[in-house]
């Protein structure tokens, strides 16, 4: 797919019979309206075992470029997405062995809801317990109003010239990831606004695009389009920190290999600014290097060297246009380059209302507003728009005001109470430790205090990994001084008792080294800081190569990480720090990156009762005239409202069971007859689970992982005990597995639409806490002293059976649990070893049965399977060798290979223990 996408756009050479070359492109990307466009309906193509039918395909110059799959009203377009992925997984599909490999875009619609997304490799789409998707978009107008109706979408997106421009200009090939990207509507409008401003030479401008909206891709596309503008001498992309310089260069070069080179120092920056090389037309640099280059007092005379560029048209694009350093350099840039045009990106503009700040000296100072610096706003895409588009999450804010008695206590007592509350709430807000959290404190001293308090609490039994980061005293170190330029509080704090803070940071890093088997020191602070950031991002569950002991639960910060840091696995911010205006929005926005349904919102636990500051920030940055309407978009519903919906979903499930004359019991679900009834249960119960998942992250309610019926739901609802809910989850997963197999194995032309349109949403039934190690530990406790364990053998089995992340291995674990006799005093390690022996014996028996069923040599089959499991790669040639002794004709051999793999795939997945086997999807 990726190679075909490159070939579609690049210039190719064809040699005529007389040896003369003819250069051509498959698609005209310069003058896209001159391409030939055609539409075909209901194309049918055979695969190895069946066939596929595509609703609508749009051809450009005879090549299939856009596929459109349509569903009836009321059926989720997600089913059309899944159908496309099923098509791509089918053995011998057209996307791998026909011109369909040139497919660029998919459009799915049920007439009233229309989405589009790029064609990509299968690993980027997953409809199971890890459920993560590539970006799926809705088109929108310039004011960010969504265009959902299919007819309106077709007119605005699929018209010949508009589609041609989208394919030619607004798609990006990421070579390092072998991935195809398409720009979002607001990114396209922003690029066009910048380009028009430059073409017409209409001065400066700024783009207000919220944090997390992908401004790097927007600026990259603007820069690359400027590269071909002969009137522009240079395009300078300016960032304000060394780490962002590296990060931005890597992002730009990811989008286009070799796009920008590193400026190791100001010498190399000036050299590239003076270069006529086409490769040096786009330059990424820091504001600090640029400031030095334009300083007439600098002893290296860079100022004199650059005078030849003084009257050239140079475009400056600023990564974050209201950083403290920007104001100091703005005047120098405008004075030196009078013909320059300046464009800024910001997620939180400076308005009159938030322009005042306190200097370190204690005096009041004034930012220039974003409009003062950049003249006019060219486009906006606010956090309100992003939340409404599901590009970022809403916020769930809990305010914890101190009790009157606490106010009378010492500061140490208050901090201890806050730390204990954090420990108490952390499991719930992070969805059983699936996610991690930042803890924002008001000073370095507070960060140190909280670190020590939390460490003390953890030593008394809590299983949490705590880290802390703040900048050390600079002591003349230029790298640290640069890091601290935007860390106002940390810079101020380090002026008082610097040795004490340095010693505390050394202890923190030493603890970090011990926890994570690293070897950092305060002299390598940047390396420590980078490792900590990566560890937060590596929280991904489940990841068998990244054990829980390597993960971070809570990182205590002062200023660091509260701006510019993104991780989809960070979902909570604890706050004991005064925040307001853009600082508040930036800090809150660390929590709201989209993942899947297990992360419904970003959690904010504020221990300073700053509701007024939150309301003010929402009103200021929402872009809405009605602050109350903005609040409803930004903030999630209360626990009481979600609980009401949860109870309503249970009531609807009860009514559904009653409509089939069945008691409201998990054991009765097996008596549902027919696919329609089973599908009805799937749709009803997953809504119960959806609201349960949301409620589990509300700190207003505390829910243990396992509760008895007497403890049922801690007041959430009296309608389902935790045991009953777990039992319903078990039957849901059994039924979902049954219907999914039926759908996957149904290769007939007319698939039952009731099953075809089901969306199982397995992600709602997975737990980050309940993994292999957790279960083995519980079994060890049970076999050692069942009288002391909180759950029965039956509850333990139910626990395993009701979690989707154990779905491939749950039958083996359950069989092992049932095989265990009472008290035998085994350790956890002995339990694991015993389970492995049990499992391997079970695997061996199953392999013998498969070999017998297909008349294969047991030894040959064992060798074939071992090769796959060891290498995590399926080799089709090895399968042919396995079947060769049967001496079958081509058609019978193909059938036999498919039958063998149908039997083997479930076993191979269990043996792979959650790791992906490359190439196996062809038989799934």
Label each region the model flagged.
Residues 203, 228, 233, 246, ...:
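Catalytic cores and motor modules of nucleic-acid processing enzymes
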Residues 77-80, 86-87, 118-119, 125-128, ...:
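Signature of the SF2 helicase/ATPase Hel1-core->accessory helical subdomain module
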Residues 43, 213, 239-242, 263-272, ...:
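Conserved helicase motor
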Residues 60, 199-203, 275-279, 296-314, ...:
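Short basic/glycine-enriched coil/helix segment immediately N-terminal to the Walker B
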Residues 281, 407-557:
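Conserved C-terminal RecA-like helicase domain
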Residues 254-299:
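Inter-Walker segment of RecA-like/P-loop motor cores
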Residues 279-293, 548-563:
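Conserved two-lobed SF2 helicase motor
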Residues 1-234, 243, 247-259, 278-279, ...:
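ATP-dependent helicase/translocase motor core
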């Amino acid at each position: 797919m990726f190679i075909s996408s490159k070939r579609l756009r690049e210039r190719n050479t064809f040699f005529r019979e007389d040896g003369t070359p003819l250069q051509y492109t498959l698609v005209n990307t310069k003058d896209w309206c001159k391409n030939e466009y055609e539409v075909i309906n209901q194309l049918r193509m055979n695969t190895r075992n069946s066939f596929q039918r595509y609703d609508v395909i749009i051809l450009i110059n005879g090549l299939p470029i856009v596929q459109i799959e349509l569903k009836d009203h009321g059926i989720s377009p997600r089913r059309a997405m899944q159908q496309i992925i099923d098509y791509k997984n089918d053995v011998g599909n057209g996307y791998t062995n026909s011109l369909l490999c040139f497919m660029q875009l998919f459009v799915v619609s049920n007439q009233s809801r229309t989405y589009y997304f790029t064609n990509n490799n299968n690993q980027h789409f997953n409809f199971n317990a890890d459920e993560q998707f590539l970006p799926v978009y809705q088109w929108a107008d310039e004011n960010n109003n969504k265009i959902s109706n299919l007819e309106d979408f077709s007119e605005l997106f699929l018209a010949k010239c508009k589609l041609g421009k989208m394919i030619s200009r607004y798609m990006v090939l990421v070579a390092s990831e072998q991935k195809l990207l398409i720009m979002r509507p607001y990114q396209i409008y922003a690029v066009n606004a910048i380009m028009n401003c430059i073409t017409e030479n209409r001065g400066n401008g700024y783009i207000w695009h919220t944090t997390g909206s992908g401004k790097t891709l927007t600026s990259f596309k603007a820069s690359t389009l400027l590269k071909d503008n002969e009137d522009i001498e240079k395009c300078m992309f300016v960032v304000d920190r060394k780490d962002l310089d590296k990060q931005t260069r890597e992002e730009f070069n990811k989008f286009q290999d070799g796009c920008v080179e590193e400026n190791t120092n100001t010498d190399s920056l000036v050299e590239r600014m003076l270069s006529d090389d086409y490769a040096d037309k786009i330059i990424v640099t820091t504001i600090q290097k640029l400031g030095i280059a334009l300083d007439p007092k600098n002893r290296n005379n860079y100022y004199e060297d650059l005078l030849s560029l003084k009257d050239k048209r140079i475009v400056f694009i600023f990564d974050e246009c209201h950083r403290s350093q920007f104001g100091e350099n703005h005047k120098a840039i405008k004075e030196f380059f009078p013909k320059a045009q300046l464009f800024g990106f910001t997620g939180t503009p400076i308005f009159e209302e938030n322009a005042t700040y306190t200097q370190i000296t204690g005096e009041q100072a004034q930012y220039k507003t974003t409009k003062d610096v950049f003249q006019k706003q060219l486009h906006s895409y606010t956090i309100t728009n992003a939340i409404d588009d599901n590009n970022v999450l809403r916020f769930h804010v809990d305010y914890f005001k101190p009790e009157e008695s606490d106010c009378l206590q010492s500061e140490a007592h208050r901090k201890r109470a806050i730390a204990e509350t954090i420990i108490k709430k952390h499991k719930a807000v992070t969805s059983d430790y699936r996610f991690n959290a930042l803890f924002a404190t008001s000073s370095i001293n507070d960060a140190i205090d909280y670190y020590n308090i939390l460490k003390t609490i953890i030593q008394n039994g809590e299983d949490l990994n705590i880290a802390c980061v703040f900048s050390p005293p600079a002591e003349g170190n230029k790298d640290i001084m640069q890091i601290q330029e935007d860390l106002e509080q940390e810079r101020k704090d380090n002026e008082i008792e610097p040795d004490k803070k340095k010693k505390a940071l050394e202890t923190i890093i030493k603890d970090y080294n011990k926890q994570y088997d690293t070897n950092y020191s305060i002299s390598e602070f940047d390396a420590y800081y980078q490792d900590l950031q990566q560890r937060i991002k590596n929280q991904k569950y489940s990841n068998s190569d990244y054990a829980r002991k390597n993960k971070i639960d809570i990182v205590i910060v002062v200023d660091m990480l509260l701006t510019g840091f993104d991780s989809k696995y960070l979902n909570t911010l604890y706050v004991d720090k005064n925040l307001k205006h853009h600082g508040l929005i930036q800090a809150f926005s660390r929590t709201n990156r989209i993942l899947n349904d297990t992360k419904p919102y970003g959690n904010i636990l504020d221990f300073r009762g700053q509701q007024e500051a939150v309301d003010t920030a929402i009103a200021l940055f929402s872009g809405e005239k009605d602050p109350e309407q903005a609040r409803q978009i930004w903030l999630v519903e209360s626990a009481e409202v979600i609980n009401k919906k949860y109870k309503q979903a249970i009531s609807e499930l009860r009514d559904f069971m009653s409509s089939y004359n069945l008691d409201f019991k998990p054991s009765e679900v097996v008596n549902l007859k027919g696919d329609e009834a089973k599908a009805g249960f799937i749709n009803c119960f997953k809504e119960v689970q959806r609201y349960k998942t949301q409620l589990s992250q509300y700190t207003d309610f505390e829910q243990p992982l396992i509760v008895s019926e007497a403890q049922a739901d801690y007041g959430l609802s009296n309608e389902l005990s935790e045991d009953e809910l777990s039992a319903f989850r078990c039957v849901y997963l059994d039924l979902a597995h049954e219907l999914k197999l039926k759908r996957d194995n149904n290769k007939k032309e007319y698939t039952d639409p009731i099953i075809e349109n089901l969306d199982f949403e397995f992600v709602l039934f997975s737990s980050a806490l309940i993994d292999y190690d957790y279960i083995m530990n519980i079994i060890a406790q049970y076999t050692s002293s069942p009288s002391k364990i909180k759950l029965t053998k039956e509850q333990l089995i139910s626990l395993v059976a009701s979690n989707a992340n154990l779905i491939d291995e749950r039958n083996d674990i359950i069989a092992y649990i049932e095989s265990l006799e009472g008290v035998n005093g085994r350790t956890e390690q002995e339990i694991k070893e015993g389970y492995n022996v049990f499992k391997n014996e079970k695997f061996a028996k199953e392999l013998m049965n498969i070999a017998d069923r297909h008349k294969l040599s047991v030894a040959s089959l064992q060798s074939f399977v071992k090769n796959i499991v060891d290498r995590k790669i399926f080799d089709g040639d090895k399968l042919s060798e396995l079947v060769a002794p049967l001496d079958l004709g081509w058609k019978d051999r193909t059938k036999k290979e498919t039958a063998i793999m149908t039997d083997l795939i479930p076993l191979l997945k269990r043996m792979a223990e959650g790791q992906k086997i490359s190439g196996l999807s062809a038989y799934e």
